[in-house]
Amino acid sequence: FAVTQIIGLILWAGISLLLFSLHQLFDIHFSGKCYAYIYYLCSITLALILFLGLLPQGEDKHNREPHSSEFLNGIIHYLFLPLTAGYLTVLYMYAARILVSWELPTGWVSWLIVALMTVCIAIQFGLYPARLENNKRFDNWIARWMPVLILPLLLLMTIGIVRRFNDYGITVNRLYLATLNGWFYFVCIGLFAIKARRINWIPISFAIIFLLTSALPVNYAGI
């Protein structure tokens, strides 16, 4: 039950961030009650449904082998992929608005894209075992083409970071954000190029960048 509670809270945080982004990007206001209703829906109702879905039925009651992979695939396909689609829709709508009005993106969009990429990488790792075992076409398509859909939005993030540099100068946090933006390009292009057949290089490359920017004697904090 604790696992389903955690999933419910993560989903609530994702939906709340999506609604808050609508307020920041399009000035669409949602009341505090709306966030409260979503919290109760995700942390109580949805968590309870997920917990009941985990209970074995029929002959599976006597099967002691775990079914965590099937549960995880269901969570990804029916909860987190639709949430990711929501993020993509909002960000592409904002990109279209920028092109029409010919204005620079706000700094908020960078953090929204960071959240989107975090979910994308989590989905890659969640789908990977099932992709190796079942080789489903839809899962392979998602693993390869989702990063391609995010690539144009990374350009939006880059423009937002450059604007922040020009308006407010260089800070340690903005240097980390710019480095993260460059790593996102590397991850998206890499996943597409190798058709997401291997993903172990993602945490390895992140660890290398972390060492170069934070752990070595010469790092961003010393600038």
Question: Each predicted region: which residue ranges?
Answer:
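Hydrophobic cores of alpha-helical transmembrane segments in multi-pass inner/ER membrane proteins
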Residues: 7-16, 39-57, 84-86, 114-127, ...
